[in-house]
UniProtKB/Swiss-Prot annotation:
Organism field: Trichormus variabilis (strain ATCC 29413 / PCC 7937) (Anabaena variabilis)
Record keyword Protein transport present: no
UniProt keywords, alphabetically: DNA-directed RNA polymerase, Metal-binding, Nucleotidyltransferase, Transcription, Transferase, Zinc
Positions annotated to bind Zn(2+): C219, C293, C300, C303
Keyword Nucleotidyltransferase in record: yes
Enzymatic class: transferase
Name of the protein this chain belongs to: DNA-directed RNA polymerase subunit beta'
Any one biological process term the GO annotation gives: DNA-templated transcription
């Protein structure tokens, strides 16, 4: 090499150049020399970095001077937009959209400005050098330092339309700082969440692909996959040469022009060859791929190609599965979790802006199909319906005419100019939609609410409301046609419920004039009593007494115990009642006032209650007790219950044992009665111990007496030779001594039908209303209820209940009457206190309130005096609502809605303009700001013309004709809001609204960036093969598209007409937009609407197309389509984030997801329907069936997500160590699975050497240790006690010369096709065992059978 000339190149070496340099050295000179070179480069770099001492100081941050003008231009544009919004030319959504796009554009422009400024003024600036050499930082960070920080998103992903205009060099304002922190926090949180997600993704990937190891040199397949450059629209994401590097050619590559072979089949493609192929202009190359490799359970060397780490063919035993998993998982952290839902996409990504190259005139050809279209900024433009061209005719310059320029516009483009328009150089002509499948702009429906900025009256202009009722009967009003909603200003008052207006439309009110009043009326009438108002607090309550009753027979005494007063009432016949309601409280109708103090119905213990003849009211609240309707007898069978809840070991007696009173039944618990013990326990916890008093009668013949269980024994009846003297209750028990009957005592309580307490009634004189204290008897327990208690309980309570006769209350919504309990001294004897019940209605007065934003001030006046007697319905007080400002009353609505409103049109709402010329407007017109009212006179604000007066006419002089006419135009201020068609209206024409009320919900479509779920979630969705949320519609068969339009121009369905005339209908759901124009031809499996494709559906469509070559070819074809789809989609996501991953890694993973099929019908094979089997395995079995003439297995290809695939691997050890351990292991145990220890995981878990890398040959290479002779092998086997429980480990495995010539005759070698080499180990050992050791025959047969089955399963 010495004689060659040294080449010197002068160029800047930045990060990219360095990369190329090292990779070139690596491919040409190998690892060692590259390492030395890299080391030298490092030293060089450090040396000069030290010399240069590059650092960033504040002075290095140079802000481009053009920033100011850029910002001013943006603000100007935004001001213009704001004016258009104020004038009602664009909707709120369009304004927001425009603001965001403007700022985005400015931010981008500023970024470019920063770069050029650095380049021109100071290319050695340290910031510039660092960012652009790739040493540290990138352009987006530099932009924040010296450009502008830009727009931030809030935590919901909505963009805040207030940009951060400053950069970190200038410093942020307080507002900007807070918004900035708001957005930055989101970034941090996202990153934290991301790492966990990405780690889990890597784990799943490793699990699904860990057993993919290079095991063969060449599988010999002729299939391959076509590779073409990956493009998005017109820009190439991955060049063909990049995609080809390191692959092996699958079919000869032919030069398109010279037709000579550039690369023969099975040639690995090196860097140079890849470039050569690309240079030759080959469109696509068929390469071998892991997806089409036919090696069983692995990938062969040729199908995998280069190991990218060494740039040479991959070695045998390389664990490519794990490498693939790590390659895909590692960049996961770099992917963004979610893209921001911007309200709309930044145009740069979806449309390409076409600007005119020169001044000239635009001509739109007649055949260019366009329709008018409103852009998302509310501008009018033309929407191109089919591909075509527009022509720019340049202006003549001197003598020669430059050639007209043709501009191609694709379907879906937007043209911003009209035919014949003059354009300047650099003017925006159109946005051309980029073709290509991936950029079908997905749109989603979103809503934005518009709130009113001022109070006033609603007036619709051009808005056509339309009502729809859905199935639930909710009606929504939408705008069928868009238009303006005007709010004409005025003061709106919310009237309280029940207020009556005292003014009419058109009345004039003064400031503090009365608008409305509410009256406070009494319902029941009676005597007015005003409680003594405490000083300084005006009276709020007015009480009206309607009836009262005094218990004149009873006296009240007070006993106080423990600081609480108990009031006892003693009646004439010395019955003592306890007052339940204390004096001074209100008692509602039906509430208990007092309770009889009575010991007759008290029991000593708990027990069991039965009713004999007693009837209670069915409907009654259990907590109040049940009212007795019919008297009778209560039968009480006492028993004492101890609730224990302790450990069973503390029990000192047995179940069924008879105990004396005072026995300790449980530690520290003694029983009070003698009787039989019943113990309830649960889980060795003692729940309760019941002692049932009574006598035990032993029984010899349980059958005879079992019928007496739970019966009553009447006095005089005989039982087991004893005559009963009193009523007993008989129960059958199993005591420790044997079966017995327990005869239990019964206590009887007589209950009278009517209580022996008089009821008191009183009738009010004025109103004829009656009030009474009714005595009732109440039982707290139901029939046959068990009362668990040790102490006694009350079985019957006699209570006095207040009942007010409510006559005719129902017509006016009566406040339920309450009675006040009061103690009054007896008129004759002052020492005796009597109980008085007073029924009163209390009315609360409104407080006077000062005016607030929505209500006028109120004033309340009282109309009655203390002690007046008033009739029902008379007015007690009235409240007046006063207006805040004078004006004219308008918009009083008829109707009785909950909130009634009225509007006062104030003087401040109107402006009057004088003009000498005749106005061009008339009263009632709605005008926007800037409208010309009369020649030379313009409106300053929007509103409605109220009046046009001619002031000059009043002159009565003769020369009236000559005098200048004076006109006065009065405008009522207003505010227009534009409404887009389809918006949901939340108000009606003529409504009155307060400031801040919602007017409409604007429904708009916002484009999703490529896909809202970018990044990790999208990759997870693809690899887990989830169905996307809004999947697109796929054409099941190819054909011509016909679009069916419903009412309006909404496409509602698509028809696809096949070549043979078959028509398939595809209805379009809401939010699905056409992707195919009318009349275009689609191949099968092509999306008809936009949205992500559902991979399962792709598989189904292509599989259902069928194929002449049988089901295997068909399944392979369908799977290949899905595989290509998945590989490309995953690549798309990584590419959009600027991450390069070699296709082969993704292919290895996708192969694992698509290698299974679901058996539909097993035919004559041993496979069961529903079983998941590898495609190649089924095919082998089917070939065997074809030879023997059996029925083949029918199957459908399935796509498994990585988790599913991991759980469905052949190796149960691997699956169990991944997820759902118990399920996997139990299934494996039930099915009697064997694990052939093929993958890495299984071997690691068991502790063997892993079959990859250096450990690969240990299990696979024949004739490793030839010095062991066959005889020794036998002796090794003889030493094992039971040949069937032999464990293979590394040391013993090596001792077997497994492929010695002597074994060939046993007939194993001819099964090679079905078996994998690994399997031979186990089988041949078994064969040795069979040949040379006497084995029990039956065991052997079983073993054989198992083995056969296993082969079927495994392979």
């Amino acid at each position: 090499m010495t004689n060659e000339k040294m080449i010197f190149r002068n160029r800047v070496v930045d990060k990219g150049q360095l990369r190329n340099l090292i990779s070139w050295a690596f491919t040409h000179y190998g690892t060692a020399r590259t390492a030395v070179m890299a080391d030298k480069l490092k030293d060089l770099g450090f040396r000069y970095a030290t010399r240069a001492g590059v650092s960033i100081s504040v002075d290095d941050l140079m802000v481009p001077p053009s920033k100011r003008s850029l910002l001013e231009a943006a603000e100007e544009e935004i001001r213009a937009t704001e004016v258009r919004y104020q004038r009602g030319e664009i909707t709120e959504v369009e304004r927001f959209q425009k603001v965001i796009d403007t700022w985005n554009g400015t931010s981008e422009a500023l970024k470019d400005e920063v770069v050029t400024h650095f380049k021109q003024t100071n290319p050695l600036n340290s910031v510039y050098m660092m960012a652009f050499s790739g040493a540290r930082g990138n352009i987006s960070q530099v932009r924040q330092l010296v450009g502008m920080r830009g727009l931030m998103a809030d935590p919901q992903g909505e963009i805040i339309d207030l940009p951060i205009k400053t950069n970190f060099r200038e410093g942020l304002t307080v507002t900007e700082y807070i918004i900035s922190s708001y957005g930055a926090r989101k970034g941090l949180v996202d990153t934290a969440l991301r790492t966990a997600d990405s780690g889990y993704l890597t784990r799943r990937l490793v699990d699904v692909s860990q057993d993919v190891i290079i095991r063969e040199i060449d599988c010999g397949t002729t299939r391959g996959i076509p590779v073409r450059p990956m493009t998005e629209g017109s820009k190439t994401l991955i060049k063909l040469s990049t995609r080809l590097l390191g692959r092996v050619v699958g079919e000869d590559v032919i030069h398109p022009k010279t037709k000579e072979v550039i690369a023969a089949r099975n040639t690995p493609i090196s860097d140079d060859l890849a470039k050569e192929i690309e240079k030759a202009g080959v469109a696509e190359v068929v390469v071998r791929s892991p997806l089409t490799c036919e090696a069983a359970r692995s990938v062969c060397q040729h199908c995998y190609g280069w190991s990218l780490a060494h740039a040479k063919m991959v070695d045998l035993g390389e664990a490519v599965g794990i490498i693939a998993a790590q390659s895909i998982g590692e960049p996961g952290t770099q992917l963004t979790m979610r893209t921001f839902h911007t309200g709309g996409v930044f145009t740069g990504e979806v449309a390409q802006q076409v600007r005119s190259k020169m001044d000239g005139t635009i001509k739109l050809p007649r055949k260019l199909r366009t329709r008018t279209h409103r852009t998302r900024h509310g501008e009018d433009a033309l929407f191109v319906e089919s591909n075509g061209i527009m022509i720019l005719e340049p202006r003549k310059e001197g003598s020669e005419t430059p050639a007209p320029q043709e501009i191609h516009v694709t379907q879906g483009s937007t043209i911003y100019i009209v035919d014949g328009q003059q354009v300047k150089q650099g003017q925006l002509l159109a946005e051309v939609a980029l073709g290509g499948r991936t950029t079908r702009t997905n749109t989603e429906k979103a809503v934005k609410d518009v709130a009113s900025d001022l109070a006033g009256e609603v007036k619709f202009a051009e808005v056509v409301p339309e009502q729809k009722t859905d199935r639930q009967g909710n009606t929504t009003t939408t705008a069928a046609r868009g238009g303006l909603i005007w709010i004409l200003s005025g003061e709106v008052y919310n009237l309280p419920p029940g207020a009556e207006l005292v003014v009419k439309n058109g009345d004039r009110v003064e400031t503090n004039g009365v608008l409305a009043e509410t009256k406070l009326t009494t319902i029941h009438g009676g005597v007015v009593r005003l409680p003594e108002a405490t000083p300084g607090k005006s009276t709020r309550e007015i009480e009206i007494i309607t009836a009262s009753v005094v218990l004149d027979q009873a006296t009240v005494t007070v006993q106080s115990s423990q600081g609480r007063n108990n009031y006892l009432i003693t009646t004439g016949n010395n019955q003592v009642f306890n007052l339940r309601a204390t004096p001074g409280t209100k008692v509602q109708n039906g509430q208990v006032v007092a309770e009889l103090i009575d010991d007759r119905y008290r029991t000593t213990t708990g027990g069991f209650l039965k009713f004999a003849g007693v009837e209670v009211q069915k409907k009654g609240k259990a907590k109040l007790g049940y009212e007795v309707v019919q008297g009778g007898t209560l039968l009480w069978i006492p028993e004492e219950t101890h609730e224990v809840n302790k450990d069973i070991s503390l029990l000192l007696v047995e179940d069924g044992q008879f105990v004396e009173a005072g026995t300790e039944v449980v530690k520290d618990i003694f029983c009070q009665n003698s009787g039989v013990v019943e113990v309830t326990q649960k889980n060795d916890i003692l729940r309760e111990v019941v002692v049932k008093p009574g006598e035990l009668l032993m029984v010899d013949d349980p059958e005879a007496v079992i019928g007496r269980d739970n019966t009553l024994l009447q006095p005089g009846e005989e039982l087991l030779g004893q005559v009963a003297t009193e009523l007993r209750y008989i129960q059958y028990v199993e005591s420790p001594e044997g079966p017995a009957l327990l005869s239990r005592p019964v206590v009887e309580f007589a209950v009278p039908s009517n209580p022996d307490v008089p009821s008191t009634t009183s009738v009010s004189q004025q109103t004829g209303r009656s009030i009474q204290m009714r005595a009732v008897q109440r039982l707290p327990y139901k029939d046959s209820e068990r009362v668990k208690s040790v102490e006694g309980v009350e079985l019957l309570r006699t209570q006095l209940v207040l009942e007010i006769e409510q006559e005719g209350e129902q017509e006016h919504n009566a406040s339920p009457l309450a009675a006040d309990i009061e103690l009054i001294p007896d008129p004759e004897d002052a020492d005796v206190q009597r109980l008085q019940l007073v029924i009163l209605e209390s009315l609360v007065l409104r407080r006077d309130i000062a005016a607030d934003a929505t209500q006028g001030s109120t004033q309340t006046s009282l109309e009655v005096k203390d002690g007046d007697t008033i009739v029902p319905g008379s007015v007690v007080a009235r409240t007046q609502i006063l207006s805040k400002e004078g004006g004219i009353v308008r918009g009083v609505q008829k109707g009785s809605e909950a909130v009634r409103r009225c509007l006062v049109l104030r003087h401040s709402d109107m402006t009057t303009l004088n003009t000498s010329a005749k106005p061009k407007v008339k009263a009632g017109d709605l005008i926007v700001a800037g409208t010309e009212l009369a020649p030379g006179v313009f409106a300053e604000e929007s509103g409605q013309i109220v009046a046009v007066k001619n002031a000059g006419e009043s002159t009565t002089t003769q020369d009236a004709a000559l005098s200048t006419q004076n006109y006065a135009v009065t405008i009522r201020a207003g505010r227009p809001y534009r409404v887009s068609p389809g918006a949901v209206l939340q108000i009606e024409d003529g409504d009155l609204v307060q400031r801040g009320d919602n007017l409409v919900l604007l429904v708009f479509e916002r484009a999703k960036t490529g896909d809202i779920i970018q990044g990790l979630p999208r990759i997870e969705e693809l690899l887990e093969a989830r169905k996307p949320k809004e999947a697109c519609i796929l054409a099941k068969r190819g054909g011509e598209v016909k679009v069916v339009y419903g009412d309006g121009d909404e496409a509602i369905a698509i028809k696809v007409i096949e070549s043979n005339g078959v028509v398939t209908d595809y209805p379009l759901g809401p939010g699905q937009n056409l992707a195919m124009p009318d009349g275009s031809v689609v191949p099968a499996g092509q999306p008809l609407s936009d949205g992500p494709s559902n991979p399962h559906e792709i598989l189904e469509v292509f599989f259902s197309l069928g194929s002449e070559d049988g089901v295997y070819a068909c399944a392979s074809h369908a799977l290949q389509k899905v595989q290509t789809f998945l590989v490309n989609e995953v690549q798309m996501v990584y590419q959009s984030q600027g991450i390069d991953i070699a296709d082969k890694h993704i292919e290895v993973i996708v192969r694992q997801m698509t290698n299974k099929v679901r058996i539909d019908d097993g035919g004559d094979t041993t496979m069961l329907p529903g079983e998941l089997v590898e495609l190649r395995q089924v095919e082998q079995v089917n070939e065997a069936m074809a030879i023997t003439g059996g029925a083949r297995a029918q199957y459908t290809p399935v796509l498994l997500g990585i988790t599913k695939a991991s759980l469905n691997t052949d190796s149960f050890i691997s699956a169990a160590s991944f997820q759902e351990t118990t399920r996997v292991l139990t299934e494996a145990a039930i099915e009697g699975k064997s694990d052939w220890l093929r993958g890495l995981k299984e071997n690691v878990i068991i502790g063997r050497l892993i079959p990859a890398g250096t450990g690969y040959n240990t299990y696979d290479e024949p004739g490793m240790l030839e010095d062991y002779s066959t005889l020794e092998t036998t002796s090794v086997l003889d030493e094992t006690d039971d040949p069937l429980d032999m464990v293979l480990d590394d040391r013993t495995a090596r001792a077997y010369n497994l492929d010695s010539p002597g074994l060939a005759e046993t007939g194993f070698s001819n099964r090679r096709s079905i078996l994998d080499d690994d399997e031979l180990i186990a089988d041949e050992i078994h064969d040795l065992v069979e040949a040379e050791v006497e084995v029990d025959d039956e065991v052997d047969d079983d073993y054989e059978d198992d083995d056969e089955d296993d082969d079927d399963y495994e392979d």
